[in-house]
Amino acid sequence: MGIEKKQLITNGFFSKKRERIEEVVTMLKKSGVNSLLLSVDAFHQETIPLEPVKYFAECVVKSKIPVKLSPAWLVSEEDNNPYNLKTKEVLGKFKDLHIPIGSGNIVFPSGNALKYLSEYFEDGVAYSSPYEEDIFDVRAISFSPNGDVLNGNINNNDIQDILESYRP
């Protein structure tokens, strides 16, 4: 299929067991993953322990898979809110690994963000999602944990067939 960039976006929490974390990184390397974005921020670390994620990052660095930290920023990276301050603190815990920090994502007011974080967004401002894409110009595909992708499911159909039959 000629897919040059095989990128994985992950929270890095596959196990608390170091041996399993090492196995996962080895499998990622063997599968051809050549770009990894590691989501580390205040939101992920509310429910995910940092130690196994940091060990995962150490293993990824050792494996030579190109990796960037990918934080989620509330409102903007520059906004001085408690979530962004915590995110900066979490990112600091990875400093010794010398992993570059990517642009990450901006949390915008929609869904649960609007429901639980509305106090951080200005009233009366029309926000739009920076992540909406043209359905006729697919440049990347994302798989849901259950295998859903575009108009099919990789558990039921070959990915090549799904891509060839895609009609927006």
Regions found by a protein language model. Name each.
Residues E22, N84, K88-G92, S118, ...:
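Generic detector of well-ordered alpha-helical segments enriched in charged/polar residues
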Residues T10, V67-W73, I99-N112:
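A generic structural motif
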Residues G102-P168:
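Accessory C-terminal segments flanking Radical SAM cores
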Residues G2, K68, T87-S103, G124-S128:
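Short, electropositive alpha-helical surface patch
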Residues M1-L91:
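Radical SAM/AdoMet-radical enzyme domain recognition
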Residues F13-F14, F43, F56, F94, ...:
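Phenylalanine-focused residue identity feature
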